[in-house]
Amino acid sequence: MNHSEQASAYKAVKNIVLVGRTGNGKSATGNSLIGKDVFVSEAKATGVTKTCQTYKAVTPGGSRINVIDTPGLFDLSVSAEFISKEIINCLRLAEGGLHVVVLVLSVRTRITQEEENTLSTLQVLFGNEILDYLIVLFTGGDELEANNQTLDDYFHQGCPYFLKTVLGLCDDRKVMFNNMTKDKHKKVEQVQQFLALVAKVEERNEGKPFRGKMYLEIKEETEWLKKQKKAVEASNLGEAELAKMKKELQMEHDTRMSQMEDMVKNMLKETSAAHERMVSMLNENLENAHRENIDLRKAHDHEQKKRMMIQLGLGVPGALGMIAPAALAMCSIL
């Protein structure tokens, strides 16, 4: 990449998509990145963000960012129809492609099945390449700071296997945010740390944003609609006929987008079914292992008792039970 290309890439808007479990602080993180409260953020288990929202801003360092706040895209309690619509909506808002996907986790809560599903579902929908654009952001920095702890201290307390896997897959790109801080220096510092990771993502991908098959299909469909509407407007049709043609074009476009949503919905259902099978298999294996462990322990205890009884000459009736007294008698004769 030459100097002019680097300058162009630096000035280009970077699409930053926030994903994660409802209640982890995606909206608050979006506000921290932008530098003001633009997304509604409240500590509610049901979440506040009901649909994908976007806001463009310029960081103190001059980076132009487009932050896309999402609802619980992979929330197990919502329908596949809703999720598929919002995934399509998210890709529409990321004009030019995805520069960074931020998996927002919280140090306040344990890793849930939903969060584990988020990663695998991203891979199913977009392929393993999406991991090259992944950053893991931990909220709850205020809680760690109150206990004089760092993010590394948090990991030393016991890092779940899922986290080790995620961080390994994304080259350990992680950062902690304190979305509650009033310290202006702290606010700027944590955004700079985040943008340093964004720069690493860009370097790894040679400045190219993620544009998977789904994104390209949405882009193509959107451009088709614009082109067709422009052609219709340029024609000498009457007002009523023009409105009719535009309506028909929009209906055709909506039908195609609906087909795309159905495709995403089916992929999500397949992923969900695979997760259920995997969890069921894991639970079955754990139960079998638990039963085997109990059986082994019983067998071990039985053998140990048997050996002790033999050593004491109390274990087996008959000849074996006479070994100890016979041995003592022989010793006395000798």
From Swiss-Prot:
**Protein name stated in the entry:** Immune-associated nucleotide-binding protein 3
Q: Where is this region: G2?
A: 47-51
Its family remark reads:
Belongs to the TRAFAC class TrmE-Era-EngA-EngB-Septin-like GTPase superfamily. AIG1/Toc34/Toc159-like paraseptin GTPase family. IAN subfamily.
Quote the PANTHER family the UniProt record gives.
AIG1-LIKE PROTEIN_ 48352-49494-RELATED, GTPASE, IMAP FAMILY MEMBER-RELATED
Q: List the disulfide bonds.
A: none
Q: Ranges for the AIG1-type G domain? A: 11-219
Tissue range of expression?
Answer: Mostly expressed in pollen. Also detected in lateral roots and radicles.
| Region of interest (G5), ranges | 178-180
Give the CC-aspect GO terms.
endoplasmic reticulum; plasma membrane
Q: Where is this region: G4?
A: 139-142
Q: Which GO terms describe its molecular function?
A: GTP binding
List UniProt keywords, sorted A-Z.
Coiled coil, GTP-binding, Nucleotide-binding
The induction text for this entry reads: Up-regulated by brassinolides and nematode infection. Down-regulated by 2-aminoethoxyvinylglycine (AVG), high CO(2), isoxaben, and propiconazole treatments.
Q: Which Pfam families match?
A: AIG1
Q: Which InterPro entries match?
A: G_AIG1 (IPR006703), GIMA/IAN/Toc (IPR045058), P-loop_NTPase (IPR027417)
